Design a protein with these regions (language model features):
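Boundary at the C-terminal end of the N-terminal hydrophobic targeting segment
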Residues: 16-20
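Sec-dependent N-terminal signal peptides
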Residues: 4-14
């Protein structure tokens, strides 16, 4: 390596680490890397300390994969609305063999590594209303997203990981059909859920052996969809579990609230509930008979540490 290049690299490492960042990503070349994937690849496998990556403003069109060996990665954007990680795959888009990519293959970003944190970023699937098109696919355990946006249409956020615990705080999530879906246990704190066109907010596939699925706490459900065009959820698998606590529900929410996905037996196995919903979409007396309104005592059982099995994502 030439002395000048080595000096420049060491200087950048010193400056970025002084700011609390291990790596800086910038499209203009002012960081160590021009792409986020390069920074992901540079994270040492199975490192036992946090690796912090700062991403400068820009639209980064990349299909991202954070490998399972890349743990404790913290990804921070310079500006939530101006630091955009995007790609445009979708379910029926063909791979190099002429086969459909499928829903899982459509994701713009895959997170396999455990203890991942993202802040001040936009994750987008820019393919448009073309069917299933995932913006974020999370399999790793103990994933945290703070002040992030998730943009798409159908199947925007795939909480994929079996046994995975996920936490979303002050995030914006938009979509049409089943745009928050999967088998993971996920807590959504003060998030804005934006309903587009019409459809279903959630499609949990919670396993029978998992006590908690989705918990929305103090969230706001709004959107530009017509009044009465959205269900709070439907069960992708029989034992789906979704609870809304102290949420503001916009006019987009149907009075009946929940759908059983054309399968009568789901009414006996799915666990859907609300507590102190408010707003024009809150209609407890008109909800389907097989969903519940929680008592004060029942609602108190829903705490971060209980739902997330001892993990407190608010602690660094």
């Amino acid at each position: 390596m030439k002395p000048v290049l080595l000096f420049s690299l060491l200087l950048w490492l010193t400056l970025s680490q002084a700011l609390g960042y291990d790596f800086v990503v910038a499209q203009d070349g002012s960081g160590q890397f021009r792409t986020v994937q390069e920074a992901f690849n540079a994270v040492p496998d199975f490192r036992k300390k946090v690796t912090t990556i700062f991403v400068k403003k820009g639209v980064y069109k990349e299909k991202l994969i954070l490998a399972g060996s890349k743990n404790l990665v913290r990804l921070i954007g310079e500006d939530r609305k101006k630091t955009i990680l995007t790609y445009d795959d979708y379910n029926q888009k063909k791979n190099i063999f002429g086969e459909d990519k499928g829903t899982s293959g459509s994701a713009s970003c895959y997170i396999y590594g455990a203890d991942f944190t993202a802040e001040n970023l936009t994750f987008q699937n820019s393919s448009g209303p073309v069917g299933q098109a995932v913006a974020m696919w999370v399999a790793g355990d103990k994933a945290r997203f703070k002040n992030c946006r998730f943009l798409g249409f159908q199947d925007t956020l795939y909480t994929y990981g079996y046994g995975s615990r996920q936490y979303y705080e002050d995030c914006y999530i938009e979509g049409t059909v089943d745009f928050i879906f999967g088998s993971s246990t996920a807590w959504f704190e003060r998030c804005t859920i934006f309903c587009k066109t019409g459809g279903f907010v959630t499609a949990a596939s919670t396993p029978d052996s998992t006590r908690y699925g989705y918990v929305f706490n103090q969230c706001r459900l709004t959107g530009n969809a017509p009044a009465g065009s959205f269900y709070l959820g439907r069960p992708w698998r029989p034992y789906a579990k979704t609870v809304y606590l102290r949420c503001e529900l916009g006019k987009q929410i149907k009075p009946e609230g929940w759908d059983h996905w054309d399968k009568e037996s789901n009414k006996q196995t799915a666990r859907y509930a609300e507590y102190q919903s408010r707003g024009p979409g809150a209609a407890p007396k008109q909800r389907v008979a097989w969903a519940r309104q929680l008592s004060d005592a029942e609602a108190q059982q829903y705490t971060l540490q209980t739902v997330l099995r001892g993990w407190d994502p608010t602690q660094e």
